[in-house]
Structures are given as C-alpha cells and as structure tokens.
C-alpha cells in the first residue's frame, strides 16, 4: 500500500511542478520579470489568487498574460489524475472524462452568457473585449483562484449572479480548487 501512496504523491508533485514550470516560463516569455512570473504561476496553480500587484492581474493589462493564466487555472482545476492520464496517453484522459467535459462546458456557457451581458449591457464596446474579461473572471472564480482583471462592481446583475454561482460550483475533485466541486452536481 505504501508504494501506491508513494506513486500517487510522485504524480501529484510531477503535475504540480510541471504546471508551475510551464506557466512561469510562458509568463516570462509574455513579458513578466522572473519574480512576477513565478509568483503568479504558483498562485494560479494553487488557485489561491495571490498577486504581487495591488491591481492583481489587471496590473499587467496583457491578453497574453491573461490567456496563459486562464489555461493554467483551468488545468489546475481539473483532477490531477486525469491530467496525468492525458500526459501519458491513457484512455481516461481529459477528452474522455465526463466530469471534465461538464466542467469545461459550464465554463464555456457561462463565459458566453457573461460576455453577452457585458457587451449588450454596454460595459465593453466590443465582443472581443467582453469575451476577454468574461473568460478571465469566470475561470478565475470557478477555479477559486480569485485573480481580477476588471472592476466587476460595474458589471450587470446577470454577470454578477453568474460569477457568484460559478464560485460556488468550482473545479473538479482531485484538483487544487476549493468549493463544492463539479463532480457533486
């Protein structure tokens, strides 16, 4: 039994450190200094929301940085065993996990609805702008990372209610996210 636990710990460490390394490198390539890249990456993988800047990720005002962190937060909120299965070519991977498909579907649908609310509510003048900020905030809250890129206090009630709703549902069991978990719905 101890060999099984040792193997599971190794897998968790491999996924956690691998995500942190890849995210750090990508953030550095996107223009951050090494300190900011490492701390934002560590926070995104841990889905803890700590930022070195008072304005959180909004400080960087970078689509590249936001995109990297969206991917990192999404991956960190998926069961690490499923991520490992995906990396090793096993059948029970991201594309075959029913929970992961549900989770990613929730993210996609809520992002589109929030973006529509922002665009038609006149908060952002372009669909691209509405999608940019909606995607980041939805992923940040459903993953329980808590990063911010926008002042959501000026967002329409529909967007706020959806953001609160996804922050309750959260990510998948076996990930770094907090909350109830998608698996239980």
Predicted segments, located by residue:
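Membrane-proximal intracellular helices of multi-pass ion channels
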Residues: 2-185
